[in-house]
Amino acid sequence: MPILTTSSLDGSVLEIVLDRPKANTIDATTSRELSQIFDSFNRDTTHRVAIFTAAGEKFFSAGWDLNASNEGEAFDSDYGVGGFGGFPELPNRNKPIIAAVNGMAVGGGFEIAMAADFIVAADHAQFFLPETRVGVLPDAGTIRLPRLLPRQLANEIIFGGRRLSAAEAESWGIVNRVVPIAELMTS
């Protein structure tokens, strides 16, 4: 079973699905593959928008694969041209990317969602950065979140690990739209 699948929807929409049971985590190999997919998308003339989502309904992504770290993979390894998750650092990005958040967006998964141009979330989705609970700062979370939220709320999420429901994330402008899971890919 492939970890990443792509398909063309309506001819101009590229759907990218992450499928790494149990929590759709991302290791360096997966990140490099995502970078290649998003770099190709950026250059192709067929697709005008990409939708990035994940398999299942529990996790959009739990971010970095901690098991890969336990097996010796360096946390700061080569993620590919687009950075961790394939597109947050992609140079000359010229087409919109939609994160279709189908479950929990945790740590790096939340950071990847924030790097998208639009976020559509299932009504049961949650967003949080638990890294500081184990003494690690959430890399991009410390940069992106304070740009989206009042500083005090951003600090509470970054340093306190506060969880946001999809509805609360929408009320603060992090999420563009909250929909039932059945409507996530069609809204």
Regions inferred by a protein language model and the residue ranges of each:
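Crotonase-fold acyl-CoA enzyme core
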Residues: 91-187
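Conserved CoA-thioester-binding segment of acyl-CoA-metabolizing enzymes
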Residues: 1-57
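Generic recognition of short, well-ordered alpha-helical segments
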Residues: 28-29, 64, 111, 140
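An acidic, glycine-rich surface segment that forms the CoA-thioester-binding/catalytic face
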Residues: 32-39, 43, 66-102, 137, ...
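Short strand->helix junction
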Residues: 23-24, 59, 135, 177
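Hydrophobic/aromatic residues within transmembrane alpha-helices
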Residues: 16, 52, 65, 112-114, ...
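Short active-site-adjacent helix-start/loop capping segments
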Residues: 25, 59-62, 68-69, 107
